[in-house]
């Protein structure tokens, strides 16, 4: 999530961007001084696994699962996308576009570049533009979502700037899959589950979260976040098993919903006056306006999180760390917050730890709750240890003039300029392994 304002102003700690990778095993952070990756394998320790200071003002940094492939955009060149191998410290290729890059999404098949009024679909093996979705409704926030599933490889983006229509696009067959009328208000957040068969949506009003089947577009679940006030939804995130959905906003509360079908019980004749009154009340809902009837059928939060702040941009993730379900929240205040989630009972989640994301030497904060924590906590400082374990990238390798002559340049009609990779290396690529990365060796300026 882009944590900077429209003017490029950073949040606390000079943070410009934060996002979890596709399987929630690492966190990428972009800042005024460069970008970093943190491992999410432990609650007590936030291990910095890489830091790069060669590129300043990093406003987008997206990692492909746990591989070495990373896509980078800088505020100094907001129309240029760099694709790098961060462990080798090499730039694999770059592309320039006709307008500012607002978002980049990756999976093992495709790389999506979102501009305000167009979307570019790249083949991640050679970075060639396969398709361009032109003249999309104005999308200044760069809102879009890409499924991480190889078989259900769908892209979702707003189909209107005035109402909450979702366009679903098949990025493998390069054709429109569906249009979902999700909300009356414009869209604010989108998220696919790991299987690519469910899509969660929220509107700018922020009170109702809906989940649709993909590609059919059938409404599966509807959850009410609240009725007292409208909020700005910051992020939606499914757990990897698709059983839970989290929704964070500009308020201090994160809601976690449980996606389980309601089992209908056979009707029973009421034996008391209270039971009879309840039956009459439920029957009367068929005569109420549809908006009121929907409120009777909307699910409520299974669990909640109380954040120690309000008003900060943030991004949430549901993951499993050390065999325990956790909710993680990265915020523009410069911290990563870790909470425990009880998958059986729900309720209010306990804050376990909060870690600084700016690499400072400040001691990691511990929050001890003996009733809910899985093991004793010990306060430690991890800045020095993380720095010792970080990779130190060498200067990026650049192709010589002789190599440039052997590569065929690629130019898209709307201004995406880049090049092609070698076919022999592409054919040997195995993108299902995290150690692999697309064998692109070109560079364009």
UniProtKB/Swiss-Prot annotation:
One GO-annotated biological process of the protein: pexophagy
Localization, UniProt: Preautophagosomal structure membrane
Annotated positions of the Phosphoserine modification: 395
InterPro entries on file: PROPPIN, WD40/YVTN_repeat-like_dom_sf, WD40_repeat_dom_sf, WD40_rpt
SUPFAM superfamilies in alphabetical order: WD40 repeat-like (SSF50978)
Gene Ontology terms: cellular component: autophagosome; cytosol; membrane; nucleoplasm; phagophore assembly site; phagophore assembly site membrane; protein-containing complex
Principal location: membrane
A molecular function (GO) term: phosphatidylinositol-3,5-bisphosphate binding
Keyword Phosphoprotein listed: yes
Complex formation: Interacts with TECPR1. Interacts with ATG16L1. Interacts with ATG5. Interacts with WIPI1. Interacts with WDR45. May interact with NUDC. Interacts with ULK1 and RB1CC1.
Family: Belongs to the WD repeat PROPPIN family.
Function, as annotated: Component of the autophagy machinery that controls the major intracellular degradation process by which cytoplasmic materials are packaged into autophagosomes and delivered to lysosomes for degradation. Involved in an early step of the formation of preautophagosomal structures. Binds and is activated by phosphatidylinositol 3-phosphate (PtdIns3P) forming on membranes of the endoplasmic reticulum upon activation of the upstream ULK1 and PI3 kinases. Mediates ER-isolation membranes contacts by interacting with the ULK1:RB1CC1 complex and PtdIns3P.
Stated name of the protein: WD repeat domain phosphoinositide-interacting protein 2
Species: Rattus norvegicus (Rat)
Species classification: Eukaryota, Metazoa, Chordata, Craniata, Vertebrata
Gene, per the UniProt record: Wipi2
